[in-house]
A protein has these predicted regions:
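Short, glycine- and charge-enriched coil/turn segments that flank and shape catalytic ligand pockets
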Residues: 13-21, 91, 106-108, 142-144, ...
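Conserved catalytic motifs of the protein kinase core domain
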Residues: 1, 21, 112
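Active-site/ligand-binding-proximal alpha/beta "capping" segment
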Residues: 95-148
Length: 171
């Protein structure tokens, strides 16, 4: 068995990072494996800040830490009053993922802003949804084919992040 002891870092809340880079916001995420995988996805795509609602699972849950595969050392998590934080962002794109959103492949995406990902079962909360100014949807393929109702949260986050970064590479 291995035991590690370290000081839990505290990162100061700074909305300026959202105006200068792409960040994630997680609204009431419950599954520690999903959180860990999302942290790993963020690290892969160079996203350094994740803002979490107070009700999001603890980042130091053993399953979360294991799923990050070390990415937790490079990605900064901020637990906050998520609706208040988002409301404080001025002139910054706030993207959210919704089953009734617009096809993300047809929308203009920016290299900075906040991408909100919602709870595994309930999606983005109504309070946070009211603050989103760009509602996105990941379309299934082919469009008329009957498929699963939705994607796993971590998988959806990976697809969204990949599309944002793909667009940046083509700028």
């Amino acid at each position: 068995e291995v035991l590690a002891v370290f000081e839990q870092p505290f990162y100061e809340m700074n909305s300026d990072v959202v105006s200068q880079s792409l960040c994630l916001a997680l609204d009431e995420i419950q599954d520690p494996g999903n959180l860990g995988t999302i942290i790993r996805v963020a690290d892969w795509f160079g996203i350094e800040h994740i803002f979490c609602s107070q009700g999001t699972v603890d980042v130091y849950n053993p399953k979360t830490i294991q799923a990050t595969m070390g990415a937790l050392a490079r990605v900064k998590l901020h637990y906050c009053d998520l609706p208040s934080f988002i409301a404080s962002l001025k002139d910054i794109p706030v993207y959210g993922t919704f089953l009734d959103g617009d096809n993300m492949y047809e929308k203009k995406l920016t290299p900075h802003g906040l991408i909100v990902m919602g709870n595994e079962g309930n999606g983005v909360s109504a309070e946070v949804a009211n603050l989103v100014n760009e509602r996105l949807y990941i379309p299934n393929y082919p469009p008329q084919r009957e498929t699963s109702e939705s994607l796993n949260l971590a998988m959806a986050t990976g697809i969204i992040c990949a599309e944002f970064r793909r667009r940046m590479a083509n700028v």
